[in-house]
Curated annotation (Swiss-Prot):
MF term (GO), any: GTP binding
One cellular-component annotation, GO: cytoplasm
Domain (Roc): residue spans on this chain: 393-626
Gene3D superfamilies linked: P-loop containing nucleotide triphosphate hydrolases, Ribonuclease Inhibitor, ROC domain from the Parkinson's disease-associated leucine-rich repeat kinase 2, Winged helix-like DNA-binding domain superfamily/Winged helix DNA-binding domain
Function: Probable GTP-binding protein. Functions in innate immunity and more specifically the inflammatory response as a regulator of the Toll-like receptor TLR2 and TLR4 signaling pathways.
InterPro entries: Leu-rich_rpt, Leu-rich_rpt_typical-subtyp, LRR_dom_sf, LRR_domain-containing, P-loop_NTPase, ROC, WH-like_DNA-bd_sf
One Pfam assignment: LRR_8
PROSITE patterns recorded: LRR (PS51450), ROC (PS51424)
Domain COR: 637-861
Protein location: Cytoplasm
Name used for this protein in its record: Malignant fibrous histiocytoma-amplified sequence 1 homolog
Length: 997
């Protein structure tokens, strides 16, 4: 019996499960029948299915409909509650819609409605009505008959006033009036009792709020962004249920005294206003969690800001704040702290207590304590630094980095020797050794020391010169006044001004004229005045260019996004407000990042030492100037200084991490405190330590002089010198000599070298195979070369391992298909679409960028074929082409483009091919914080036609999702030409906007 019972129970359970599964399937089927989405196929007329009686949600959006399908009105007797008609082409609300009396939700946004008729009153059961992004100027009085209406969205229209009957909407909770043409705050809203959320942003002529706003007691969320508000009425303080208040992009400079009464406020945005003082009433908002005060004129934060203990988000970027109160470290819940673009030099002690901060932005501040390099690494590094400072005796050691640069034969090396070896004038020799480093104790009594970098003028070294540019250095631009002529100002001076500006914002530059013993007095005066004048002209021209760009962005921001998105001729077609604001911020940053050029031109002679003493005194004076070089007067932990000095002693090329850690122990640094110290020494250019590289993180390259000697070997481009190094071994026979000639020729023409030849070239500098491997790994990390047949294992079956240095490639064109060279796609390939992303550099193209980019992309591509200015390769089976077009005067900027192609259905493969390359290029460009460049996506249709000037779509679109419901874009080069949206927008946003630095 027991067995039968068990069997019966089991059968009952199985039967119950079958019935349950059937019920679930039936419920799911009914659910799918309740929601129906219909789409047009090939622009045919939309036809409704026969039986829609059970359908509750009908979506006819994104169909470009001008009229609704037949039979829609017959659904009035059914269960239809939600009708979606968004993104069509309706000029009026279709009559059939007004007969659907059971509707509770109607979405007819993104159409072309110019009016809403009084028949809207027939939709008496509506709870949600969306009419945004149309062309409505008025709303009918009958809107007041919709007594069940809870949500109304009429944003992005042209409404100038609201009907009086609006106050008859007792259930209305959410009202969106964003971006209309309302000139005053509608008093009808005072009598909408249930209103909780109101968006009034973008009604630009508001100016002020009426006192009667106090009656809106139910408000929880209020948006008043970009409404030209100059003053808030006291009555706003009576909206005691407010939780979020947006007041950004106005002209406010104070808040009402009673503002602290808004005790339920959780979020306040007053960014982009005119506050000069921190509003005292805010200090009473002890439960405030988010405060945005970016882009104001704040100078000081109050000490009692610590009473705002619940703050999680605090944005204070782009103000004029000089210091932070010590009490800010008590804001223990802070997770976002944005302070970039201020004048903060010192962070409070115990700043590391803000351990929850995960969004931290501090760049563009004159930080000296902790050092800028430490602050940029994050809160944990600041904590480690401050802890170290507390553990050890602080030490101050002024040691200024001096960078000499200029054209070949400008006199840099002789000038360095005159400055650093004043006692011995007989030893002066011209320098052709490449880049050289000299330590110069300028004044032992005053403790002033310099480390002098003499950057070679030969263009062969252009790829590595930027590695020696760093913040906090003094740049001496050396000009040969004998060879200087006015019409070549840009070559002698202007180019270097652009170079330093792009790499090092706010850099200090001293211009020194040499060879004055070869010039007469009148010639000197004229040339110095010309240099001074042309610098001013160039700086003014650049500033005016940037100012014009800012005005262009401002004009675009003054337009509705909907206008930009629908107007192909707009300068920023489809670009979001967020990206435009980011772009404007970047342009303003470029405007404020100009060089500090010490004038006038200092003229010297290295032959008779004329004015050398005066130049020395000038350099010492500048070095001691706290406002010019505050970093020289920062306090560092003595243990960090000792660690630096201990690393100078070993003569080896590199140290293992453990060797370095043992030196750290001598300096009093335990292993856990070592990482921060090494990171600082790397960021400040004292040694190289790559903690982000799997191989190199185990080593410390402390001997920079030897490393520079190694770099000089590769970049001097002198065949006789290279050949001499290879044949220095007396045992070299005639066969070997011939091979050496072949290798040198291959290197100088194609950039190719095998490892055994590299080892021979570096023989004086490296001793072991490990030395060689680490140097090659380091050169790859720096983007100077790549291995073309790197073995996956340690052995390559006896084959020779080759390295390629792209900067040496001289052949003009790689072997590639015809379309790469600009010829039209042949007839069978007309279905192929081309993707091309173009980077343009109007002021200056970073030297060596194309060669370094060529190295960085090597891990992403196969079957590559390189020329001097072009790379043809594959990513998987998809072709990619990287091209560089050097600048040709002011009217033809340098251009770097990344291209691929595929058929339209497979265009995602082309995006997949170029996206990693775009990301690598963006990463390299981050090294040039003040570089002005643009990014565009070129029109595929124009490229297919062979147009010499294809239309450029804004590169910002790469960082935006594809617009909802949009399948085609218009090319303004030909108004009737349409291209698929997938040819401009990637499948998902793939890159940071070019102005996000």
């Amino acid at each position: 019996m027991a067995g039968n019972d068990t069997c019966n129970n089991s059968c009952d359970v199985k039967t119950a499960r079958l019935w349950r599964d059937a019920a679930l399937r039936s419920r799911k089927l009914r659910s799918s029948l309740r929601q129906l989405t219909l789409s047009c196929v090939d622009k045919r007329k939309l036809i409704l299915p026969a039986d829609l009686g059970d359908v509750e949600v009908l979506n006819l959006g994104n169909n470009s409909l001008e009229e609704v399908p037949d039979g829609l009105q017959s659904l009035s007797a059914g269960n239809l509650h939600v009708l979606i008609l968004r993104r069509n082409k309706f000029l009026n609300v279709p009559t059939a819609v007004y007969h659907l009396g059971r509707l509770t939700e109607l979405d007819i946004s993104y159409n072309r409605l110019s009016c809403l008729t009084e028949a809207v009153g027939l939709l008496g059961k509506l709870k949600k009505l969306c009419l945004s992004h149309n062309q409505l100027r008025t709303l009918p009085r009958q809107l007041g008959m919709l007594v069940d209406l809870e949500e109304l969205d009429v944003s992005f229209n042209q409404i100038t006033h609201l009907p009086d009957t609006m106050q008859g909407l007792p259930s209305l909770r959410t009202l969106d009036l964003d971006h209309n043409e309302l000139c005053s705050f509608p008093q009808q809203l005072f009598h909408v009792p249930a209103l909780e959320e109101l968006d009034f942003s973008g009604n630009k002529m508001l100016g002020s709020l009426p006192e009667g706003i106090r009656s809106m007691q139910s408000l929880k969320i209020l948006w008043l962004s970009s409404t030209s508000l100059c003053l808030l009425p006291d009555s706003i303080c009576e909206l005691v249920n407010l939780e979020s208040l947006m007041l950004d992009n106005n002209n406010l400079h104070t808040l009402p005294e009673g503002f602290g009464a808004l005790q339920k406020l959780k979020m306040l945005n007053v960014s982009s206003n005119a506050f000069q003082d921190f509003p005292v009433p805010l200090l009473q908002l002890v439960d405030l969690e988010e405060l945005y005060m970016s882009r104001n004129r704040l100078v000081v934060l109050p000490e009692v800001i610590s009473c705002m203990t619940k703050l999680v988000t605090l944005w204070l970027d782009n103000n004029r704040i000089r210091y932070l109160p010590d009490s800010i470290v008590e804001l223990s819940f802070l997770e976002e702290l944005v302070l970039q673009g201020n004048q903060i030099a010192i962070l409070p002690d115990d700043f590391g207590k803000l351990s929850k901060v995960n969004i931290w932005k501090i760049k563009d501040n004159p930080l000296i304590q902790p050092p800028y390099e430490v602050c940029m690494k994050g809160i944990s590094y600041i904590a480690a630094y401050q802890k170290e400072l507390a553990h050890s005796q602080p030490a101050v050691k002024p040691r200024l980095k001096l960078v000499l640069l200029g054209l070949k034969d400008a006199g840099k090396t002789l000038l360095r020797q005159c400055l650093t070896d004043e006692q011995n004038t007989s030893t002066l020799v011209q320098g052709y050794k490449g880049i050289e480093i000299t330590n110069w104790t300028a004044d032992a009594e005053r403790g002033l020391a310099f480390i002098v970098y003499d950057l070679a003028g030969d263009q062969s070294y252009d790829i590595i010169k930027p590695f020696f540019f760093s913040p906090g250095a003094l740049y001496i631009l050396v000009v040969n006044l004998k060879s200087y002529v006015c019409k070549h100002f840009y070559t002698h001076v202007g180019y270097f001004i652009h170079l330093i500006t792009s790499k090092v914002p706010h850099a200090v530059v001293c211009i020194v004229g040499t060879h004055i013993d070869l010039c007469n007095e009148k010639e000197l005066e004229e040339k110095c005045l010309d240099i001074h004048h042309q610098i001013a002209v160039q700086e003014k021209r650049d500033s005016e260019t940037l100012q014009t760009l800012i005005q262009t962005v401002d004009k675009a921001l003054s337009q509705d996004f909907d206008f930009r998105a629908s107007n192909p001729h707009s300068a920023f077609y489809g670009v979001s407000d967020k990206n435009l604001r980011r772009k404007k911020t970047h342009f303003q940053y470029l405007m404020n990042s100009r060089l500090q050029i010490l004038s006038p031109v200092l003229c010297v002679s290295c032959l008779d030492f004329s004015n050398i003493k005066r130049l020395r005194e000038k350099l010492l004076s500048v070095a001691e100037h706290r406002e010019i070089f505050p970093n020289l007067h920062r306090v560092l932990p003595k243990s960090w200084q000792m660690l630096e000095e201990l690393h100078f002693k070993p003569q080896e090329l590199w140290l293992t991490w453990w060797d370095s850690a043992r030196l750290g122990l001598q300096a009093g640094l335990t292993e856990d405190r070592m990482q921060s110290a090494l990171s600082f020494l790397h960021e400040s250019g004292k040694l190289l330590y790559f903690e982000d590289n799997q191989t190199l993180k185990e080593y410390v390259f402390h001997n920079l002089t030897k490393l520079i000697d190694i770099l000089n070997v590769f970049f001097q481009r002198d065949a006789s010198v290279l050949f001499a190094k290879l044949t220095s071994d007396a045992t070299a026979d005639e066969t070997k000599v011939t091979q050496f000639h072949h290798y040198v020729e291959g290197f100088l023409l194609h950039g190719l070298l095998p490892t055994h030849i590299i080892r021979s070239l570096l023989k004086p500098h490296i001793k072991t195979h490990q030395d060689l491997q680490l140097i090659l790994e380091l050169l790859e990390k720096m983007g100077l070369c790549y291995c073309i047949n790197k073995p996956k294992n340690k052995l390559l079956n006896g084959a020779t391992v080759w390295y390629k240095f792209p900067c040496y490639v001289k052949n003009e064109a790689p072997h590639a298909e015809a379309w790469i060279n600009g010829t039209n796609i042949s007839e069978p390939c007309l279905a192929v679409e081309q993707l091309q992303i173009e980077y343009s550099f109007p002021f200056i193209f970073p030297p060596g960028l194309f060669a370094r980019f060529s190295v960085q992309i090597n891990s992403h591509i196969v079957h590559r074929s390189d020329s001097k200015f072009q790379i043809f390769a594959y990513r998987g089976k998809v072709p990619v082409v990287v091209s560089f077009q050097p600048a040709r005067g002011a009217l033809q900027p340098g251009i770097l483009s990344i291209a691929s192609h595929a058929s339209l259905p497979n265009i995602w493969t082309a995006w997949q091919a170029i996206t990693p390359l775009v990301e690598e290029l963006n990463a390299l460009l981050q090294e040039w914080p003040s570089l002005y460049y643009t990014v565009h996506v070129l029109c595929s249709k124009c490229l297919k036609r062979g147009s010499p000037n294809p239309h450029p779509f804004p590169g910002e679109l790469l960082s935006q999702p594809r617009p909802d419901g949009v399948t085609e874009l218009i090319c303004p080069k030909n108004g009737s030409e349409r291209l698929n949206v997938s040819l401009v927008y990637p499948p998902t946003p793939t890159m940071i906007s070019p102005c996000s630095k």
